């Protein structure tokens, strides 16, 4: 069992980022609702209090009872967490004269304090709060200030309790990782959470959990399901059967390429060609949500049919990852949404769930995959929607439209790799628009399809910026598509960020 850090979630948008930063420092942590501290746990080394959208003095603000936490564990309050500690200890928190958002610099630092070891005056931090601590309790000592915020950081004398009104977890706080590492050292953390240690402990747990039972797993070709398959295969070998469904909406040659990759990994995979079924059921359907539902139900039907051909299956493997687990519970403990990679499977299957990746963030899944010896092109694949090209064809879906989009997308992705751009992009693809336009090819007038290129940079898909790809690259892609893809005479580039736009068009 790994020792762990507990992050109490008060509803901040950056709570998961705190968790990722701690994990990057090789320390295992768990994010739990603010009022669900695991008091019975014996392996907790320290506690972080997250930010929150509330003000501490709001009637509906989330309030935690810290009486059994403070003094027993080292505590670090971040933003709202820092204000909550001060406010509940007798300090004052009030609306700031001007809201503090964006970059600031530390103008005063107590270099003797353990939390700020190795951090110097001038260090850039990131503020994001509308309130400020105006009066600290008597035993709270200011250890860092900015020109505008006196209590940018404090230490509670006589306790291993600290608060910072800035966000060390965000990229813009240049010494934020150093501060978090200092806190882990204060907690006495061994920092032994590594891909290798995760694989060793998880494989052992899977062997004990599954014994000689048989497991089925739906593969998508994506990172999560692929790493799940390799981990399960390492634990139970031939007792794992994987099913990979070709719904006719994969990228060009993807079914054959992915099947070859899985064979190379030694996986037992059943490949199912279900193109005709999906094309028939999608014929004439234009409404995006209806398309999604048809594709989702079709996949479940095919998977269920194949699963029933197998004997003595006891478990369903899924590539659920930690953000799915966190998001499935609100911080009040009520279910918001259920996350199932194979959602809606018939109850008659009566299978137990096994989710080997449920403790990992996405970047950790990739590192585990690399440690398992998986090929880089499998590990570094861009996210690809479950409905595939079905939501990149605006309007109704036909085999001819799929052919056009596959050819255009293949050119875009191939050139992106050739130019060394693929690994710099979070997600990219081509969208076939329900628009035709006039063009001229040779001496003839054409009236053909328009495609849009999409590429974004991101760290978590919650927000995304459109990628500023080189003009020369875009010109090359446009020229290649128009000359080589029959049925396309115009290429445009989507320069919308998320928000307000989403990454996918449907």
From Swiss-Prot:
Gene3D superfamilies: 3.30.300.10, 3.40.50.880, HUPs (3.40.50.620). One of its GO terms (cellular component) is cytosol. Homodimer. Its EC number is 6.3.5.2. This is GMP synthase [glutamine-hydrolyzing]. It is an enzyme of class 6 (ligase). Residues 193-381 form the GMPS ATP-PPase domain. It holds the Pfam family GATase. The keyword Protein biosynthesis does not apply. One of its GO terms (molecular function) is GMP synthase activity. Keywords: ATP-binding, Glutamine amidotransferase, GMP biosynthesis, Ligase, Nucleotide-binding, Purine biosynthesis. Residues 4-192 form the Glutamine amidotransferase type-1 domain. It comes from Parabacteroides distasonis (strain ATCC 8503 / DSM 20701 / CIP 104284 / JCM 5825 / NCTC 11152).
